[in-house]
């Protein structure tokens, strides 16, 4: 199962051409199991301008699996991720990224993200990042073909 970070969803919804958003598009069309944590949903919805957009996006994302709720153990482990990275010279900029990394570590999710904080975390913890196949780079974006 793949946990998709906010950075990739934003590119996807905005039609931004990135390798990660192209891979997400492939995962959706191939019905690959994806998980959306509540924190990611919150971040996505915070960036939308209208309630109608927020409702439409929330409804669309509700079709994917929801990550299990956080517990105290996750909070402690996320703080540990931050401290251990900082102690190794890799300061993580986002508390939420530490929590998302912890969810991936705890539940065995692969992570699809663009955020450099996850690169730093993966240097210290066994965070599994999605290896995007080269052929995804060659797939056309359906939006770019519409005139």
Task: Name each model feature, range by range.
Residues 1, 101, 105-147:
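Acidic, PIN/NYN-like endoribonuclease modules and their adjacent C-terminal/linker elements
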Residues 21, 41, 54, 75-79, ...:
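A general structural signal for well-ordered alpha-helical segments in protein cores
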Residues 66-112, 146-147:
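Active-site neighborhoods of divalent-metal-dependent phosphate/nucleic-acid chemistry enzymes
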Residues 1-36, 46-59, 138-139:
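Short, well-structured N-terminal submotif of metal-dependent ribonuclease cores
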């Amino acid at each position: 199962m793949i946990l998709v970070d906010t950075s990739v969803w934003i590119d996807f919804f905005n039609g931004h051409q990135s390798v990660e958003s192209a891979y997400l598009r492939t995962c959706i069309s191939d019905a690959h199991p994806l998980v959306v944590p509540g924190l990611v949903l919150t971040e996505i919805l915070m960036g939308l301008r209208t309630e109608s957009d927020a409702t439409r996006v929330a409804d669309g994302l509700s079709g994917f699996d929801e990550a299990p709720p956080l517990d105290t153990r996750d909070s402690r482990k996320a703080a540990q991720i931050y401290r251990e990275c900082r102690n190794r010279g890799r300061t993580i900029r986002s508390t939420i990224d530490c929590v998302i990394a912890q969810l991936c570590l705890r539940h065995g999710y692969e992570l699809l993200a663009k955020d450099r904080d996850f690169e730093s975390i993966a240097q210290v913890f066994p965070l599994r990042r999605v290896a995007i196949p080269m052929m995804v780079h060659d797939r056309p974006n359906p939006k770019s073909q519409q005139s």
